[in-house]
Amino acid sequence: MERITVNLAERSYPITIGAGLFEDSAHLSSLTAGQKVVVITNVTVAPLYADKILSLLQSLGCQASLLELPDGEQYKSLDTFNQVMSFLLEGSFARDVVVIALGGGVIGDLVGFSAACYQRGVDFIQIPTTLLSQVDSSVGGKTAVNHPLGKNMIGAFYQPKSVIIDTNCLKTLPEREFAAGIAEVIKYGIIYDAEFFTWLDEHLDALYSLDEQALTYAIARCCEIKAEVVAQDEKESGIRALLNLGHTFGHAIEAELGYGNWLHGEAVAAGTVMAARTAQLQGMIDQQQFDKIFSILSRAKLPVHTPESMTFDDFMTHMMRDKKVLSGKLRLVLPSSIGTAEVVADVPQEVIRQAIEDCRTIN
C-alpha cells in the first residue's frame, strides 16, 4: 500500500493506494458513528462497488444514502448537477454531511462541484474507480461540469478530504477505458519525469496485463507528481497548467464531436500528438523525441491522428475558448523535451494549422 500527502497547509489530505482497500473500513476512519454520508455514483459502477462502500459505512455506524446517476460524459452537466442538489435538499442534509464520489472522472468532477456548491461547501471524499480518475482527476481539487460551448467551463477549485484508490477496480474496467487512463499516465512522463517515461515504455505490457506491482507504482508516481505540482500551484496560475498537455486540442475534439463520442483520454492522446508536432515545428523537440511520444501512445492503443471530420477552423473555434487563453492569446502546453514542458503563447496559427494537418496522416 502507498500513501501520499497533498500538502496544502490546513487543507492537506491523504491519497491511499493499494489492492483490496474496499475491504477495510480503516481508510474511512475519519467518519464517525451517526455521521450522515451520501454516496453518489452512476448506474455502471453501482452494481460493482456501491454495496461494498455502503457496508463499510454501516460498519462505522454512519447513516448512508445512495444516489445513482446516468453514466457518460454527456451527463456531466448542469441538469445532473441540479439533480444532485435536489437530492441533497429533499433529504434535508445539513452542512455536516459528507459526500462520497464513487466512480470515474465524470462522477468525481460533478460530485466535487456539487460538494463545493451545496450550502457553500461540504466535505467530500474521492473514491475513483477508473485509471484516468485515479491518476489525475481525483487529485488536486479541480471540479466542474461541462457547457455545450466548452468543457469544464463551470466549476471550482475544491479539495477533497481524502482520496482512496483501490487498484482492484481496474479489473472490471473495459480496455478502452483503461487505455484512456494510460494517456494521462504517459502525459506525466512527457511533462515531468523522463525516467518515468522510459519506465512506461518498458512496462506498457505489464500495465495492460494488470500487473499489481506495476499498476501501484504507476498510479503512485502519477499521484506524487500531481501532488507536487498542486502544492506549488493550486489554482493553476503557473506550473499546474503543464498538466494540460494535449488538453487544448483534446477539449476541442470532445466539444466538436460531442461529449462521450471520444473518451477524454482518447482526445488527450490525439491532442498530445498534435502538441508534440507543434513543438517539433517550433524547434522545441527533435524528430526522435516526437517519434517516442507518437510510438508510446500508438502502442497504448490510443487515437493518434486528427479526427477526419474536424477542420482547422473547428479546432480554433473551441481552442480560443480554452481557459488558458489570456488577453485574446492562445497559450499551448508544449513539450520541450521528454520530461519537460512549457506554456507557449506566441505559436503562429499557420504552425498550429500545419500540425493539425500533419497529424491526419503521420505514422
From Swiss-Prot:
| Cofactor remark | Binds 1 divalent metal cation per subunit. Can use either Co(2+) or Zn(2+).
Q: Which reactions appear under catalytic activity for this entry? A: 7-phospho-2-dehydro-3-deoxy-D-arabino-heptonate = 3-dehydroquinate + phosphate
GO biological process per UniProt: amino acid biosynthetic process; aromatic amino acid family biosynthetic process; chorismate biosynthetic process
Instruction: Enumerate the residues binding NAD(+).
Output: 71-76, 105-109, 129-130, 142, 151, 169-172
Give the matching InterPro entries. Answer: Dehydroquinate_synthase, DHQ_synth_AroB, DHQ_synth_fam, DHQS/DOIS_N, DHQS_C
Subcellular localization is given as:
Cytoplasm
Provide the cofactor list for this protein. Answer: NAD(+); Co(2+); Zn(2+)
Q: Which Pfam families match?
A: DHQ_synthase (PF01761), DHQS_C (PF24621)
EC code: 4.2.3.4
Q: Which residues bind Zn(2+)?
A: E184, H247, H264
Q: Give any Gene Ontology cellular component.
A: cytoplasm
Main location (coarse class): cytoplasm
Q: Which GO terms describe its molecular function?
A: 3-dehydroquinate synthase activity; metal ion binding; nucleotide binding
Q: What keywords are assigned to this protein? A: Amino-acid biosynthesis, Aromatic amino acid biosynthesis, Cobalt, Cytoplasm, Lyase, Metal-binding, NAD, Nucleotide-binding, Zinc
Pathway(s) this gene product operates in, as recorded in its UniProt entry: Metabolic intermediate biosynthesis; chorismate biosynthesis; chorismate from D-erythrose 4-phosphate and phosphoenolpyruvate: step 2/7
| NCBIfam families xref list | aroB
What is this protein's function per UniProt? Answer: Catalyzes the conversion of 3-deoxy-D-arabino-heptulosonate 7-phosphate (DAHP) to dehydroquinate (DHQ).
The family database entries (HAMAP family) matched by this protein are listed as: DHQ_synthase
Question: Which family, according to the similarity comment?
Answer: Belongs to the sugar phosphate cyclases superfamily. Dehydroquinate synthase family.
Q: Which PANTHER family match?
A: 3-DEHYDROQUINATE SYNTHASE, 3-DEHYDROQUINATE SYNTHASE, CHLOROPLASTIC
Q: What is this protein called?
A: 3-dehydroquinate synthase
Write the lineage as a comma-separated list. Bacteria, Pseudomonadati, Pseudomonadota, Gammaproteobacteria, Vibrionales
